[in-house]
Amino acid sequence: EMERVNCPLYICLNMRNRYHDPYTDEPGRNRFWGGAIENIVIENVRAVNAETPSILTGFQTARIDGTPVRRAVRNVHLRDFHVKYRENPAYVNVPEVTPEHLFGYPESNAHGDVDASGIWARHIDGLALEEIDITPRAADNREIIRLHDVR
């Protein structure tokens, strides 16, 4: 059980390159396109007085030649997930497009405001949500769950 937590759940696959290697498309040389987050089961979560939505995200970008690159978080199962948000004023400024946040340190507040009040998921292959109970702030009029590029 969590009390006064900022972000109840944060799963982020991005391209943070801590080795400072130059980005290249050369096979076998670049850690940039690597990495995976997959086969996750999270259950029996209780959070009260939460501040920001849970965020689950992979990434999408393009190679130097413009070829799209998509790295999804795969096979995530949330079960028995209960979150109640803190009743304080909500000052939300959701951009038309949420940036990918590819290079910075992966932390929930780096994404800024998103268009969900409870769970925001993007670039996910295989997301199962069971027994989800989210109570947003009374003043928050965003949808509780938003899925973008979730297959």
Question: Whereabouts are the PLM-identified features?
Answer:
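Extracellular/periplasmic carbohydrate-active domains that bind, remodel
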Residues: 1-151
